[in-house]
């Protein structure tokens, strides 16, 4: 279903109107009036559709039509009425004498709507829109457009090339790399202040050396020997007893060589081991004299069954006859009694 066609299209002319057709239509309407647009073409002797005759008369041939461009005042009225009425172009045309609804609609779609959208996109406020701003923008754009036409055409902005993107990326990464050492220096300077370096800004390696020396001065090593351990540095001397502690840390380089950490040194390991061996041998020999088993104990101390670990602080003995004797500390003469064999 739908509206019936005004007339049959077969044998009718289409396209632009000629001056003769405009003259025939104008004379007929002036003498007979508009009347019915369906029967008007046949009565006037035109091979045109009734709709085509109506649009030609209303939009072009009327005497009360305004010719020329739409003024700024008319633009203001159109914007205000459109905000109130919407797309009701016929009602808007009644407030603009000499302008047709078709002309107003075409002007809105082609000019005003685009300018209003651009203005609201820049300002970000669509409610407080002033028509004067739109009109001023139109005048400014027309003047600037005339100036730009006289100048040479500018290069069109397209997508950025990959080479420029790579250069930008390299510049960004380089700036980040330069900023990182500054942050590290600030961190080390703060760490030096927390470590009682009196606010001196030290490098990373100097800061680590200072921390190592501070840790060496605070660490504790339990000495198990009864003799005094005297360092190479004369300022640091530690005398120890049975369960005394010394402020030193051991890192042995080779067996029988002197070990060094910073400025602290200790006596040779071989010397300590020989002293302990002689002391233990004398102790065992004294006990063997009491039990009349001197030969067996002396042979035990001098035999290869006694194992000395160079890297260990404890001495392990494995005796024959399933008798084992281990000591975590040095032997106390008061606690040792007679040893009985199975």
Swiss-Prot record:
Induction conditions: Triggered by HY5 in response to light and UV-B.
A cellular-component GO term for this protein: nucleus
Keywords (A to Z) from UniProt: DNA-binding, Nucleus, Transcription, Transcription regulation
Region ranges (Disordered): 140-169
Subcellular location: Nucleus
One GO term of the biological process aspect: positive regulation of flavonol biosynthetic process
Short name of one Pfam family: Myb_DNA-binding
InterPro entries: Homeodomain-like_sf (IPR009057), Myb_dom (IPR017930), Myb_TF_plants (IPR015495), SANT/Myb (IPR001005)
PANTHER family xrefs: TRANSCRIPTION FACTOR MYB111, TRANSCRIPTION FACTOR MYB8-RELATED-RELATED
Protein name, UniProt field: Transcription factor MYB111
Underlying gene: MYB111
């Amino acid at each position: 279903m739908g509206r019936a066609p005004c007339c049959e299209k077969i044998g009718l002319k289409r396209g632009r109107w000629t001056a003769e057709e405009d003259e025939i239509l104008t004379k007929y309407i002036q003498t007979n009036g508009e009347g019915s647009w369906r029967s008007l073409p046949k009565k006037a002797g035109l091979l045109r559709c009734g709709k085509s005759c109506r649009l030609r008369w209303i939009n072009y041939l009327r005497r009360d039509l305004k010719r020329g461009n739409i003024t700024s005042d008319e633009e203001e009225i159109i914007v205000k009425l459109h905000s109130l009425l919407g797309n009701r172009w016929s009602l808007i045309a009644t407030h603009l004498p000499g302008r047709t609804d078709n002309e107003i609609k075409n002007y809105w779609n082609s000019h005003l709507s685009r300018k209003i959208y651009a203005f609201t996109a820049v300002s970000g406020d669509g409610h407080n829109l002033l028509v004067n701003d739109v009109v001023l923008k139109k005048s400014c754009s027309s003047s600037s457009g005339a100036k730009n036409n006289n100048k040479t055409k500018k290069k069109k902005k397209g997508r950025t090339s990959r080479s420029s993107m790579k250069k930008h990326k390299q510049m960004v990464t380089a700036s980040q790399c330069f900023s990182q050492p500054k942050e590290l220096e600030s961190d080390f300077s703060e760490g030096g202040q927390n470590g009682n370096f009196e606010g001196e800004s030290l490098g990373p390696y100097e800061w680590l050396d200072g921390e190592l020396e501070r840790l060496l001065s605070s660490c504790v090593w339990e000495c198990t020997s009864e003799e005094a351990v005297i360092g190479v540095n004369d300022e640091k001397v530690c005398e120890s007893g049975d369960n005394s502690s010394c402020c030193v840390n051991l890192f042995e380089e080779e067996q029988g060589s002197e070990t060094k950490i910073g400025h602290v040194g200790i006596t040779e390991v071989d010397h300590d081991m020989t002293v302990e061996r002689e002391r233990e041998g004398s102790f065992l020999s004294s006990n063997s004299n009491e039990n009349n088993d001197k030969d067996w104990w002396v042979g035990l101390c001098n035999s290869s069954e006694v194992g000395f670990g160079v890297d260990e602080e404890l001495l392990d003995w494995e005796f024959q006859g399933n008798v084992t004797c281990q000591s975590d500390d040095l032997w106390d003469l008061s606690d040792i009694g007679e040893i009985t064999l199975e």
